[in-house]
Curated annotation (Swiss-Prot):
Gene3D superfamilies: alpha/beta hydrolase
Highest taxon in the source lineage: Eukaryota
Biological function: Abhydrolase domain-containing protein; part of the gene clusters that mediate the biosynthesis of the host-selective toxins (HSTs) AF-toxins responsible for Alternaria black spot of strawberry disease by the strawberry pathotype. AF-toxin I and III are valine derivatives of 2,3-dyhydroxy-isovaleric acid and 2-hydroxy-isovaleric acid respectively, while AF II is an isoleucine derivative of 2-hydroxy-valeric acid. These derivatives are bound to a 9,10-epoxy-8-hydroxy-9-methyl-decatrienoic acid (EDA) moiety.
Protein name from the UniProt record: Abhydrolase domain-containing protein AFT2-1
Gene Ontology MF terms in the entry: hydrolase activity
Major site of localization recorded for this protein: other
Similarity annotation: Belongs to the AB hydrolase superfamily. AKT2 hydrolase family.
Gene name, Swiss-Prot/TrEMBL: AFT2-1
Keyword terms, alphabetized: Hydrolase, Peroxisome, Virulence
Subcellular location: Peroxisome
C-alpha cells in the first residue's frame, strides 16, 4: 500500500487501530488514538460496567419524534451537527411501521452488537444461554501488553473529563508505547505524545469535532508528514528510482560490509 498511512480510532476503535499497528507491522506511519480502550486488567472492560449500561439502554420508541427527543437529551453535550448525523443514521422504522407515516422506530445497531464488544458470547459455542462463566473481551488488556511492540509514532488524544483516559492511564500509555528498540530501523525515531481537550469526556470527537480535527491535522502536517518526507519517504523513493543493476550493486556492497561486522 502507498505510504504514508495514518491510523485514527476512537475508544474500541482506537484499541483496534493500535492492535493492527502491531499485527500488521509498518502499516501505519503514525496513529492517533482518541480516548482508546487500552489498559491493564484493573482498568479493563470488567471495571467499567459497560455491559450493564448496554443491557439497560433503550432501543425502541413509539415514534421518531420520541426517539429524537431521547437522543438529544442523552447526548446533549455533542456538537449539534454531529448530533443531527447521529439522529439521521442511528434509528430506523420498524418493519410493521414502514407503511405508516409515523410509527415505532428502533436503533439501527441493537444491544447485542454492542454487548459482544465487551462480553464474549459464550452461548454460541456451548449452546446454553445460562450457567456460563462471564468472560469479558480481553482486547484492551491484550493491547496494553503489546504497546511496546508498536512500530510507529502515536498521539493520544484524550478528554479532560473522561473516566477512561485518567492521568494514570495516560502515563501508562506514554511510558510503554513503542519502547522496544529492537524493531527500529537505524536512525529511526518514534514520537509518542498526548493532547488533552479540556471540558470533554470520552466522546470528545463528537463533543469538540473541530478542535479534535485541528489537533490531528497539526500532528500529521507538522510532525509526521515532514518527518516522512525528509527521512523514510525520501529514502524509500531514492531506492525505488534505482535500476535493478544499481540495487544489486548496493546489496552486494552491503553484504561485503557485513562480513566484517558479523
Amino acid at each position: 500500500m502507498q505510504q504514508p498511512i495514518v491510523g485514527v480510532g476512537h475508544s474500541m476503535g482506537g484499541c483496534q487501530i493500535a492492535t493492527l499497528s502491531v499485527t500488521s507491522r509498518r502499516m501505519f506511519s503514525t496513529m492517533i488514538l482518541l480516548d482508546p480502550a487500552i489498559g491493564p486488567l484493573d482498568m479493563g472492560l470488567a471495571t467499567l460496567g459497560l455491559g450493564q449500561l448496554t443491557l439497560r439502554r433503550r432501543t425502541q420508541w413509539p415514534t421518531r419524534e420520541d426517539a429524537e427527543k431521547a437522543l438529544r437529551t442523552s447526548f446533549s453535550t455533542w456538537d449539534p451537527q454531529v448530533l443531527d448525523l447521529l439522529i439521521r443514521h442511528s434509528i430506523h422504522s420498524d418493519k410493521q411501521s414502514i407503511e405508516m407515516e409515523d410509527g415505532p422506530v428502533s436503533l439501527v445497531t441493537g444491544r447485542y452488537q454492542e454487548l459482544v464488544n465487551y462480553i464474549k458470547p459464550s452461548f454460541i459455542r456451548s449452546g446454553k444461554v445460562n450457567g456460563q462463566e462471564l468472560v469479558h473481551q480481553t482486547g484492551p488488556v491484550d493491547m496494553y501488553h503489546m504497546l511496546g511492540l508498536v512500530t510507529c509514532s502515536a498521539l493520544y488524544l484524550c478528554g479532560g473529563e473522561s473516566t477512561l483516559s485518567v492521568p494514570r492511564a495516560r502515563d501508562l500509555w506514554l511510558s510503554r508505547t513503542a519502547k522496544l528498540s529492537y524493531s527500529k530501523e537505524p536512525g529511526e525515531t518514534r514520537k509518542v505524545d498526548e493532547r488533552v481537550v479540556p471540558d470533554t469526556g470520552h466522546f470528545l470527537p463528537m463533543e469538540e469535532p473541530k478542535e479534535c480535527a485541528d489537533i490531528i491535522a497539526d500532528w500529521i502536517e507538522k510532525d509526521e508528514c515532514i518527518a516522512w518526507n525528509c527521512c523514510l519517504g525520501k529514502r524509500g523513493k531514492t531506492w525505488r528510482e534505482l535500476s535493478n543493476a544499481s540495487k544489486e550493486m548496493g546489496a552486494e556492497a552491503w553484504m561485503e560490509y557485513l562480513q566484517s561486522k558479523l
